[in-house]
Amino acid sequence: MFNNDKDDNNQGNENNENNKINIKTSIDMGNYINSSSLVESFGSGSNRNNDKSEDVEYDDDDDDDDDEIASTEEEKESDLDSDSDLAPTQIIVDDSDDFYNNNNGGGGGGGNEDISSTSPTLITSNSFNDKINQIFSRGGSSLNSSFLNNGENKINFKQLVKLKSTLKKHEIPSRELTVEKEIGQGFFGKVYKARWRGKSVALKKITLIKFRDLTETEIFDKEVSIMSKLCHPTCVMFIGACSLDGPSNDRSIIMEYMEGGSLRRLLDEKSSYHLPPSLQLSIARDIAEGMNYLHTNFKEGPIVHRDLTSSNILLNSSYTVAKINDFGLSKEMKPGPTEMTAAMGSLAWMAPECFKAENYTEKVDVYSFAIILWEIVTCRDPYNGMEPLRLAFLASVEDYRLPLNGFPPYWVELISKCWNITPSLRPSFKEILQILNQIESDPLFLNLNLNCSSNNTSSGSTSTSSGSSSSSDNNLTKSSESNNNLRESNINNQIKSNKNSSKNGYYAQDINDYSLSMQVETKNCIYNNVSDNVNNNNNNNNNNNNDNDFFKSSFTKKSFLSNNNYNNNNNNINNKNNNTNNLNDNLIIKSLNHISEQNSFLVSYQDSNIVKYFSLDNESLTSTLQMEQSVVCMKYQIINEKVFLVVAMSNNNISLFELKKTDFSGSANSPTTLLPIKVIKCDEQRHTIKDITWNGTHVITSSFKDSSIQIWDLEKSLYPISKMDNGGVGILSIDSQSHQPLMISGDSDGKVKLWDIRNSHCFRTLTHSPPSSSSGGSIGVDSVLFRSPHAVRDPIILTGSSKDCKFKVWNMYSSTCLNSFQSHNKDLLGIHRNQSSQQMITWSSEGTISLFNSGNNINNQNNQNNNNDCGNDNDSVEFSKVLNVNSMMSNEPLQSAQIISKNRIIFSSKNKFYSIIA
C-alpha cells in the first residue's frame, strides 16, 4: 500500500545503523489499533518520525484486509520479516509546505539532548524565531493565552462555524470539493488537502473495509457521530461529510485544515533543541483544555479519546494553537454500567491498564497526556531507544517510566501525577489546567522563560545583521554536546528507583539507557551421528568429562508400564515394572500432558476417547477418563486453584471439564465417564480444529483447513468472538501466555506470527525457515512455544520445524534470533519446556531427545524490580546434551515427550511410556 520515504539528510544514523529492527512510528508493532490521523507532511529530508523504521524491509504476507497495511518490497534473507510492523499512521511528503523549506537544513541533528540544562535553547529555524519574536513582543516574557484565543485562530474558527451552519445534515456535495493532494495516511484511510468554498480543508477518506466486525459504514458513522458533537477551539473542527463520485462511492469526512502539521512533526524536526518554556506551556494548556471539554461537556458522559498522541495534536502555521484530532477510536461513555477493556491507541502512549486489557476509564487519556508532556520538554520520541512492545510490557508490568532527570520541578510533579500507576490518583484535566496556571506564575518558569526570550531576541538581531542563521545557531546549545558526558557517567547505573511508585517501579536514568542496537549473532549447533548407547554404555563413556564433546548420554532410566525389562548395572538402571494390563495394547499413545501443579500427567491416545491419569507421586495409573469423542488436542489451566481441561474432539466440539480429585479416585481398569461443564460446537465444514491453546481467559483454536484462528469466550458466548484470517496460509501450531493477550502461530510457509487477540491483529512476523528450492518449497513451523507461559516479563519464544529439524530461540521484543540448533537428523516432532527447572527439550521419532537450559533464571528476574532490566535481550538458551533412547523402546518410533522436573523426562512409544533422569 505504501513504503517509507528515505531521508537523505538523516543525521545520527551511526547510532541507529545496528538497530534496524526497532519500529518506532506512532503505533509500531502491536498495532494496538491506531486510527487514521491527519499527519502533516515534511519537506525533503525531514521525515524524522519514520527514520527509526525506514531501514526495515516490509514483506507482504498477510492477505487479510483488516491487518494488511504494508506493501511488498524485494525480499531479503533476514531472520526478521516485519511485514506487519509498519505503522498505520504514515507521514507523506508534502513539498508545498512553505514553512519547511531548504533553509531548515533537513532537520536538526540526531544527537543526544542534555535535558538537564537550566537554560533551554530555542529551535533554530529563522522563520520560527521570527514568529516567536512577534509573540514575545506582544506578550512579554510569557505567551498570553487570551491573545491566542482572540487572534487568528478565533477568526478562522468563527468563519468555519459560519460556513458549517449553511449545511444540511452535514452533507457537502462532492462537486464543491477540489482535492489537491494526499497529505497523510492512517489505519482507517487516507487524508487529503482540499478546497471548499475558498477555504483549505482536510478530507479524510475511509478505505478500510472492515475493522473488529465493524463495516466501513459503521466506522464512518461512529467517527461522524462523535466529531459532529464537538465545537471547541482546541478540537479540530468537523465540517461535514460527503460521498465522493466514483464506482467505490467512498465516504469522506471534511475537517478543519491545520497548516502547522502535527506536534510530532515539529518535535522530530527540532529534536536537537528545546522548545521555549512558554510554547511548552501553551501547547500543554491547549491540549488540556480540549481534553477537559471532551471529558466534562457532555451530559451523556465523557468522550474518551483513547489515542491521544503527539501525532494526533495538530498545530496552526505559527505553532501558537494546538488542536486535538482523530476521533476514530474515541468512545462515548454512556450512563449506566460501562466497561472498556479493548486495547486502543499507540503503544508508547497507552496506559498500563489499557495494555493489560483491564477495565479502564477516561483516565487513560491523562496517562497519554503525561507522555506528550515528556515529548514537549525533550523534543524526543517516547520510545526512548526501546523496542515498542518491550516498552509497553515494562510500563504495564514493572511500572517503568521515561526519564525525568534534568526536568524543571514543576514538570516533574505534573508528569508524575498524570502517569501514576493507579488511574484514580491521576488528576482530571480540570485539575491539570489549574496546575498549568500555577506553573505560569512559578518563579523558575518565569526565569527560564525570560532567559529564553533574551536568547531568542539576541539571536534574532544577530541573524538580521549577518543575513544568515549561523550566528544565531552559535548561541544555541545542542543537546548532543553535553549529554554524551551524562550518558557515560550513567552507563553502569541505568535504572533509578522511583520512591514515589506504589509498585516499587523505576525510571530510566538516561534517554538512551535501553538502546537495542546490539545484534546477537545466531549460532548453529549441528551433530552428525548419534550412536545408540543406552544399553551399550560402559564406564568409560560415563566417566568422559571432555567438555568439548557435543554428545553426552549418561542417564538413569525408569520404565513405566513397559513390557521391557532392562538389566544393565553399568547404566545405573532403576527398574520399576507396573501391571501392563493397565494399558490396552491396542491403544497407541498420542500425547503426554504434564500437570505440574498436581505432579501428574494425562495420556491421550490416537483415535480414542480414553484419557488416562498418571500420578507421579506413586508412579501409577489412578484413573481412566472417558470422553464423548476421540481427543484431537487438549490444554489445561489452573483457575482459582482448580484444574480445568479444554479438549478439542474429533466431532469438532470444544468441551470444558473440571478435573476434580474425585475423578481420579477410581480404578484405572474401570473408566470414569467425565461430563463436560460446557460444550461449544465448532463449524466442522470450515474450521476443522488442528490445535488449541488456552490463556485462562479465551480458548484459541487454529485450523489448517480454512487458515484461520478463532477466539472463544467460554463464559459469555457459544460462538467465536473474533476470527483472525491467516491469508490462506495453513496454521500448524499455536501457543499463548496465561491471562495475556499475546499468542503465536507457526505457519506452513515457514513464518512465525505474533498476534494481539484483543484486536485480532498480527503485529509481527518472523521467518523461521525461508523458502528453499533444495527443500522443495517452504518448511513449515510445526512447534511454537512461549518459554515462560506465566511470566509476562520473559520475551523468549521457541520455534521448531520437523522438516529441517531446526530449533530456534527468539527475542520477541527485538525480533532477534538468539540461537539456532540443528537438534535432530530425521525430524523434530515437538518442543516442551519446564518453567520451574528452566529447561526444555525437543524430540525426534528417530529416538533422540535434546536437552537445553535457559541462559538466565526467569524466576529470579521476576523477583527483581529495581536493579534488573526485564526483558534480558541476551537471555539465550544453551544446549546441554542429546539422549538416545532407541534401545529402551526396542527401536520403535518415539512419539511424545515431556520434561517434568530438573533433568527428568518422560516419553512414549506405541502403548508404553518411560522416564529417564538425564
From Swiss-Prot:
Biased composition (Low complexity): 10-24, 35-46
InterPro entries registered for this protein in UniProt: Kinase-like_dom_sf, Prot_kinase_dom, Protein_kinase_ATP_BS, Ser-Thr/Tyr_kinase_cat_dom, Ser/Thr_Kinases-Pseudokinases, Tyr_kinase_AS, WD40/YVTN_repeat-like_dom_sf, WD40_repeat_CS
Catalysed reaction, written as an equation: L-tyrosyl-[protein] + ATP = O-phospho-L-tyrosyl-[protein] + ADP + H(+)
EC number: 2.7.10.2
Record-level GO BP terms: signal transduction
Keywords recorded for this protein, A-Z: ATP-binding, Kinase, Nucleotide-binding, Repeat, Transferase, Tyrosine-protein kinase, WD repeat
GO CC, alphabetical: cytoplasm
Protein's UniProt name: Probable tyrosine-protein kinase DDB_G0283397
Residues of the Protein kinase domain: 177-445
UniProt: ATP binding residues: I183, G184, Q185, G186, F187, F188, G189, K190, V191, K204
Region spans: Disordered: 1-122, 457-504
Naturally occurring in which organism (per UniProt): Dictyostelium discoideum
